Design a protein with these regions (language model features):
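Short linear regulatory motifs enriched in tryptophan with gly/pro/ser
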Residues: 2, 9-239
Length: 239
């Protein structure tokens, strides 16, 4: 007889009642089955209009360190700065970057939390599951992820970027206000900084471009290099 116990490793700072959890597990589709479900993430960078966004589909076994690699590739970041995830008031990332305890919150290990460990609501429209991903604490890029569990499609390779709008900002541009100033100069041929900004980002950059093929290639490359952990850790071990 099939067990109705919650899946091993189920994580939630606010657990569901046992009766509801049993109902989820004992339905026609097991919501913890990685062969049946994936996570769809609608992601956009806060403070920028029109929105810079990506629709990502992720294996439910993906951990937060791997999610970091996916987000870096999806938005064209170069992983040159610190980052963290904020989930329900808890901070996840690479604890070794806060060994002096200077952060306001303790940083928990990102590799120890997977998508499958998160508590997905019954009604994502009424009560969506959201994660805040922060990158570059100087420029303060804040990405809001809205997550929902959806059925896995046969023959599809995950993770993947399904849709997107606009190019990610250049690194070290100065946050949302700096990016607005940059675009003013980049778009206006009469601006005194126009040529300098065009040279700085190169010919391939266009603020309205979003090449899904290139993004998905970058995602695949990043995950192959990370092998379940942060790439910077693996690279430092090779050194």
């Amino acid at each position: 007889m099939r067990s109705c116990r919650p899946a091993k490793g189920y994580f939630s700072p606010h657990p569901l009642p046992a009766k509801l959890v049993r109902g989820m597990i004992c339905g026609m589709l097991d919501p913890f089955d990685p062969d049946r479900f994936i996570v769809r993430a609608e992601v956009h960078i806060l403070g920028i209009e029109p929105k810079i966004s990506r629709t990502l589909e992720l294996p439910i076994t993906l951990n937060l360190a791997q999610l970091h690699e996916v987000l870096q590739a999806a938005f064209g970041w170069t992983d040159s700065h610190l980052h963290q995830f904020n989930i329900g008031g808890l901070v996840y990332g690479a604890p070794e970057f806060d060994e002096d305890g200077l952060s306001d919150s303790r940083t928990f290990e990102a590799t120890e939390v997977r998508m499958i460990d998160l508590q997905f609501p019954y009604d994502p429209e009424e009560n969506p599951l959201t994660i805040l991903y922060e990158y570059d604490f100087g420029d303060n890029w804040r990405h809001l992820l809205r997550l929902e569990r959806v059925a896995r499609q046969e023959g599809v390779k995950y993770p993947r970027c399904l849709a997107g709008k606009r190019s990610g900002p250049p690194e070290d541009v100065g946050g949302t206000s700096g990016y607005a100033d940059f675009l003013d100069a980049w778009l206006d041929p009469d601006h005194e900084e126009h040529k300098a900004m065009r040279r700085w980002v190169g010919r391939k950059f266009h603020p309205e471009a979003c090449n899904l093929d290139e993004i998905n290639k970058a995602i695949g490359k990043a995950l192959r290099a990370s092998k379940g952990d942060y790439r910077f850790r693996r690279e430092s071990h090779r050194d």
